[in-house]
Amino acid sequence: MNPAIEFKNVTKAFVKKDGDVQTILDNVSFSIPAGKTTVIAGGSGQGKSVTLKLILGLMRVDSGRIMVQGNDVTGVRGKGLESLRTQFGVLFQGSALFDSLTVFENVALPLRERTKKNEAEIRAQVLSSLSQFELDGHEEKYPAQLSGGMQKRVGLARAMQLKPAIMLFDEPTTGLDPVMSLEIYHLFARTQAEFGFTSVIVSHDIPKIFNLADRVTILNGGKMDVFSSPEEIQWSEEPHIQEFVKTTMGDIYQSDLVEK
């Protein structure tokens, strides 16, 4: 089986205001297994969100190739890019809900824009999704009337309408308290288990999310380290990994872990 996503010798750099070049990804190669959950971690400015934007075609690589489900999508544009994006569901830091639309209208949006379903079919599917994500009775509310956790649920429900093969989450629990964050991670785990999609999560909240992950990648200084267990990371002798554990993870064994 092909990996869901594969980077082959990908380099991406930016020119800063002072003229210096900052290399975010430096000849990086890695793969994301299909049907599994991969967490991308790293400090601020290390390229986590850039990696997601490259996957979605929102940025171009400077060199190298990106494969999605076995297809080379490097530099794809036009209808090819539109087709690529139908394979993804996305939930960014903010839920990206339209404030002027109700919960129902927000969730129905991809069905109205990208399918030929009639209104009766759309209504049936949306109401079923709202029930699945414990949003019954909220369909006529507006985003501003919902808590941060409820907004995340709406965003996830909308992202799932086209049944994507791959879900991308960019800091999905930003702004939520620890209890709500844990609840949202449990929701991700249940949804992934039910639908079987590939899940890519950019997060700094490693202690709570670790048991959700089949694989963890750590970005640092343009390079990427791949780990598959808490023990593997904690016992790494690489100085930058030790620093990551100290400043970001703490003692993950004493944290409230999400069970897969």
PLM regions and their residue ranges:
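Catalytic Walker B motif of ABC-type/P-loop ATPase nucleotide-binding domains
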Residues: 167-170
